[in-house]
Amino acid sequence: MKLLEERIRKDGEVLDGDVLKINSFLNHQVDPELMMQVGEEFKRLFENEKITKVLTCEASGIAPGIMAAYQLGVPMVFARKKKPSTLNDAVYWADVFSYTKKVNNKICVEKKFLSSDDHLLIIDDFLAHGEAVKGMLNIAKQANAAVAGVGVVVAKEFQGGSDWVKEHGYRLEALARISNFENNQVHFVGEK
C-alpha cells in the first residue's frame, strides 16, 4: 500500500536498529483517514473469503481491526491482555511474548464470542517475530474456528514472523512489507 509506505517514510522512526516507531498515526495517535483506507484495503484483499469476524489484539490492533471489520460488515473481537473482572471464567487463553516491551502476556477472549461456526480474519498492527499472531491463532484453534487469513499493517519480513505464518499454511497479507532497516532508514520489499 503505497500511501502507507509513504507515511512510514515520512513519520516513522527506527529505534535500536530493529524497532519501528509509528506512534504519530497508529500506535499512540491514530490517523482515522489512513486507518479507513487500511480497512478498505483489507476488504479488497479478503472480501471473497466469507469472513464472519475479525480477531485482533489490544491495543494497537484495534484501529486497523475495527476498520477492516466495518468494511467487511462483520463484528470485531479483540483479545484482552488482562482478564477484567466483568469477564467470566469461560475464556480462551494464549501466552504471548512482547519483544517490544520484553514481557510475557496472557491474552484472552470470552468463549461466547468465537465458535466453530466462525471464519476469522486475524488483523494486527505489526508482524515481527509473530508472537501476537501465534497467540490469536492458538485462540482460534481452541474455538475450532476457521482462519481465512492474517492481515497486518506492517510486516518486518527480516524477523521471521512472516515466514512462520506462511510455513504453517496461513494466507498472509501485509500492507507494508519491510525488508530491513539500514542507517535508520526503512527499506521495503521490492525496492531497488
From Swiss-Prot:
Coiled coil: none
Positions that bind 5-phospho-alpha-D-ribose 1-diphosphate: 128-132
Keyword Glycoprotein: no
One GO CC annotation: cytoplasm
Reactions accelerated catalytically: XMP + diphosphate = xanthine + 5-phospho-alpha-D-ribose 1-diphosphate
Pathway the protein takes part in: Purine metabolism; XMP biosynthesis via salvage pathway; XMP from xanthine: step 1/1
GO terms of molecular function: xanthine phosphoribosyltransferase activity
GO biological process: purine ribonucleoside salvage; xanthine metabolic process; XMP salvage
Keywords: Cytoplasm, Glycosyltransferase, Purine salvage, Transferase
Pfam families recorded: Pribosyltran
Enzyme class: transferase
Subcellular location(s) of the protein: Cytoplasm
Binding-site list for xanthine: 20, 27, 156
Primary residence: cytoplasm
InterPro entries: PRibTrfase_dom (IPR000836), PRTase-like (IPR029057), Pur/Pyrimidine_PRTase (IPR050118), Xanthine_PRibTrfase (IPR010079)
Function: Converts the preformed base xanthine, a product of nucleic acid breakdown, to xanthosine 5'-monophosphate (XMP), so it can be reused for RNA or DNA synthesis.
PANTHER family: HYPOXANTHINE/GUANINE PHOSPHORIBOSYLTRANSFERASE, XANTHINE PHOSPHORIBOSYLTRANSFERASE
Subunit structure, as described in the record: Homodimer.
Protein name: Xanthine phosphoribosyltransferase
Organism name: Lactobacillus gasseri (strain ATCC 33323 / DSM 20243 / BCRC 14619 / CIP 102991 / JCM 1131 / KCTC 3163 / NCIMB 11718 / NCTC 13722 / AM63)
